[in-house]
């Protein structure tokens, strides 16, 4: 979906004040056309330390996988850099993550204390941007940190979600 299409159809979600013990309150602003999957939406102002992204949804009844990507735009040719791809694989009970910068995938990370997603059940994913890393929480529990591979955080301005889930809220 072209960036201009996303912006022209965009609705502004209510702005919420979020705070962190490490930062002052920040505004979480995500613009999106509709909460349909596959989904592509614009992150106003890009990522920055203190910014948080909230994804709420329900896993499908018989899921194979789903993925959440934060990207530097939505270009297909050349492909936009992928700051993080979170991929939930249900057969192997893995939550994989990686980044693709200048067309090259980095080393995939897979270690997690447990697999947090259950078929036909709701979930809440929070992505907290900090200076050296993204902190990923699922249902209120921190699962892992993913250290930035894209240097310019403000360039990370698009969220893409695809796979076996229904979105209920994005903020």
Curated annotation (Swiss-Prot):
Domain Galectin: from-to ranges: 38-170
Keyword rRNA processing recorded: no
UniProt keyword Repressor present: no
InterPro entries: ConA-like_dom_sf, Galectin-like, Galectin_CRD
MF annotations from Gene Ontology: carbohydrate binding
Keywords linked to the UniProt accession: Lectin
Database matches in CDD domains: GLECT
A Pfam family of this chain: Gal-bind_lectin
Function in brief: Does not bind lactose, and may not bind carbohydrates.
Protein name: Galectin-related protein
Source organism: Xenopus tropicalis
